[in-house]
Amino acid sequence: MEFNSLLQLIGDEPIFDSSILLAGNVDPKLIRIQLSRWVKAGKIYQLRRGLYSIAPPYQRIQPHPFLIANHLQKASYISLQSALSFYGLIPEVVNITTSVSTGRPELLDTPLGRFEFRHIKTELLTGYQMIELSGQHALVARPEKALLDLIYLQPGGDSNVYLKELRLQNTEKLDKDLLRKQVQKFNTPKLENAVKEILQIMSSKSEEFEDL
């Protein structure tokens, strides 16, 4: 296959799986060799086995980190610090894209960034939504679920000290009823205690706003 043929086949898709090249009467070994050559030539990036992205200046669309993360591990969604930063709930700029997944924990370094996956139980793989990102789409935890996921996975995450260190802001974006509803799925005193602390933080910030 010629590289221009690959570009035509991929079109505007920012990420592609090698399986799309194996349709029809083709030799898988030759396809793998060709992909390896394109990687070495700097024409494509290998994100993980079988997963690739077109490299500049050939790419039509730069893949969003959230989209990449969704492809790196199936049954995953953006959560924790990445989602909280995306919603403006914490002030920090996050340099690693964090997700939760039913798969194994992983820390992946790719040509397009670093990606971390934390494991959660299958029954907790809820509370996410499809987000539009400049024409791309990715699964991202709702604000409330991103916060609960972080507290659940962080040792001592329910402590008053840790919650204050998060420096939560724009807490009006958090739905109190959703917090109370989603915490029931975790069924753990740790999260119940944390929600009480969060509601107090939200209340105090609301009072501060009213005093201005």
What does each of the following model-derived ranges do?
Residues 54-212:
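Nucleic-acid-binding surface
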